[in-house]
């Protein structure tokens, strides 16, 4: 199986009433059976923050231009399998994750989710219920480092 490298920008989205946005990728996607945060590949010439903003808009339809955005110091790596959309080829993906903490000054119920791109499901989860879900290894580690689970 062929291996590809990808730098990934993602975000932990917080509402002002202590909910976090998590989702699951569509079938064949990265970590398809586990909960993840919105994010995706950083395009050439794009900053990590620009990529995170674009991916959030593409995956869940939320514009975070006016939100508080802070880089998370923890940089992680991970490897998983993925089916390439254009060719159907199954590949191994070596990823480096660069994440941001994004705080939106609205309650979760007032932040609509519009699923597009890679996300097949997404929901706002109260922080105290995050420990009930099964996450990708990188998201689990990230949530633990932030004291969320």
Where are these regions (language model features)?
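Conserved N-terminal beta-strand and adjoining loop/helix that marks the start
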Residues: 1-20, 38, 98-101
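A conserved beta-turn-beta hairpin within the catalytic core of GNAT-like acetyltransferases
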Residues: 29-33
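Unchanged
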Residues: 42-138
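Short glycine-centered helix-capping/turn motifs at secondary-structure transition points
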Residues: 146-147
């Amino acid at each position: 199986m062929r291996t590809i490298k990808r730098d990934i920008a993602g975000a932990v989205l917080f509402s002002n009433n202590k909910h976090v946005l998590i989702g699951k990728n569509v079938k064949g996607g990265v970590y398809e059976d586990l909960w993840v945060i919105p994010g995706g590949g950083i395009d050439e010439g794009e900053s990590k923050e620009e990529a995170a903003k674009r991916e959030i808009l593409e995956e869940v339809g939320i514009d975070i231009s006016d939100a508080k955005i802070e880089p998370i110091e923890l940089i992680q790596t991970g490897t998983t399998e993925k089916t390439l959309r254009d060719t159907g080829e199954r590949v191994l993906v070596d990823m480096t994750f660069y994440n941001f903490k994004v705080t939106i000054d609205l309650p979760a119920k007032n932040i609509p989710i519009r699923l597009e791109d890679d996300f097949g499901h997404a929901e706002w989860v109260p922080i105290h219920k995050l420990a009930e879900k099964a996450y990708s290894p990188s998201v689990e580690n990230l949530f633990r480092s932030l004291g969320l689970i």
